[in-house]
Amino acid sequence: MRKLILLLLVFVASLIAKPNVVILATGGTIAGSAAGSTNAQYDAGQLGVDILIKAVPEIQDIANVKGEQVANISSNNMTNEIWLKLAKRVNELLKSGDADGIVITHGTDTLEETAYFLNLVVKSDKPVVLVGAMRSATSMSADGPLNLYNAVSVAADKSSAGNGVLVVLNDEIHAAREVTKTNTSSVDTFKSRNTGQIGRVYYGKVVYTAKNLKKHTKNSVFDVSKLDTLPRVDIVYSHANDYGDIVEHLVKMGSKGIVHAGTGNGSIHNDVMVTLKAAQDSGV
């Protein structure tokens, strides 16, 4: 009888046990600081992860939350080196069992790029959530604290598993593959225009309205576990009166791949087409 009671107690304890969520901080506006609460100008990446966590003590009611400082930058300065560091740390934490979910605080300038990169290289179906803010931490009516609270709620929610890397801002949950920043200042900036959001989170209450069916994370073919660097890939935008010498310069600078963002339905200027074909013939 005692053994049965003990087993029941263990079972009940497992049901009420809080999940473990690790916050990996990289800086951004969510960690930004201004001279005053009404200052539009601020410096991104000024506050450490411990300060961000202490600012929202309620997250400890949702999960056992720990933080690590991976970087503290404005996300316009994001690098391949930080990407690899993030990817390897996320995979390490999720594989070890030390984390049931991951939250990454990030600047909004390149948040969607980091989210999609991780969507391709994370090898787990556990929740990985990127979160940012459009107003600095010292701003009047800062959006960061509630965004962080909601992001931890999403990462701790079992229904988030298997949806790939997620982006949470302004009460919305977006799939990394679809989301993009659409406005330079509005808190309602992140949108998935082709598919729409896949869920909502309202003061910690998580509700999914769609399922991410695209291949991602553990089903992705990409693996960076043995890589120390990523190859250089450049983006070339097309425009009227375009020149092909930009492509030639990129090849000389060591570009290993070129993405051409064409006009209309991917159209390429004749002069650029010549240099792109030459680049391709050279192995780019």
What is the predicted function of each stretch?
Residues 131-203:
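Internal gly/pro-rich beta-alpha loop/helix module
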Residues 96-111, 253-265:
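Short acidic, glycine-rich surface-loop motifs adjacent to enzyme active sites
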Residues 37-46, 110, 116-129, 144-150, ...:
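A glycine- and small-aliphatic-rich helix-loop capping segment at beta-alpha/alpha-beta transitions
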Residues 18-92, 274:
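ATP/NTP phosphate-donor binding region
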Residues 259, 265-284:
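CN hydrolase (nitrilase-like) catalytic-core segments centered on the catalytic cysteine
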Residues 18, 24, 48, 55-56, ...:
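Accessory alpha-helical/coil subdomains and C-terminal extensions
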